[in-house]
């Protein structure tokens, strides 16, 4: 019986590593998984491995994709003169739910945060700057989260992009300070984009 308890403990520990999952939720999920049919557990494990192994970064915007270029960058109907810069891929999902923004994106994969050991060179800022130098982008909307790290990242990006002669705007404050774009509702996101200000 000890080996069984050890296996359960290991599963709980792994589930706790997921964002937003505490010990009680991890425990609940672990016991749920153990009670699932073997074929369902296998399908879940295969889906996780498949997503992990087949997902890579878009060569243009650094969003997650299964091909070399994501479906947004390859869409000819998108407005290529405007790029919305976000911290994480899930921010793209949140902004796309609004169905109003028709430009392109760039995913930084984080925000500048020296206290958390996250520096500009660890983000995809160099890819963004090269992209801006090689294309006819007229406006960059900075849609980083309205927290200390997001504001620092926005200021840093604005200092780099403005000398390129590109208009730099920041999403409006409809999203609460300290909040994440990912969790905002569609109307709030739409108002934040519509009310963006030049920085």
UniProtKB/Swiss-Prot annotation:
DNA repair found in the keyword field: yes
UniProt domain Toprim: residue ranges: 81-176
Domain of life: Bacteria
Keyword Lipoprotein annotated: no
UniProt-listed InterPro entries: DNA_Rcmb_RecR, Rcmb_RecR, Rcmb_RecR_Znf, TOPRIM_dom, TOPRIM_RecR
CDD domains named among the record's database cross-references: TOPRIM_recR (cd01025)
GO biological process: DNA recombination; DNA repair
Keywords attached to this entry: DNA damage, DNA recombination, DNA repair, Metal-binding, Zinc, Zinc-finger
ZnF C4-type: positions: 58-73
A UniProt-annotated Pfam family: RecR_ZnF
GO molecular-function term, one example from the UniProt record: zinc ion binding
UniProt-listed SUPFAM superfamilies: Recombination protein RecR
Family: Belongs to the RecR family.
Function field: May play a role in DNA repair. It seems to be involved in an RecBC-independent recombinational process of DNA repair. It may act with RecF and RecO.
Name of the featured protein: Recombination protein RecR
Species annotation: Caldicellulosiruptor saccharolyticus (strain ATCC 43494 / DSM 8903 / Tp8T 6331)
Gene field: recR
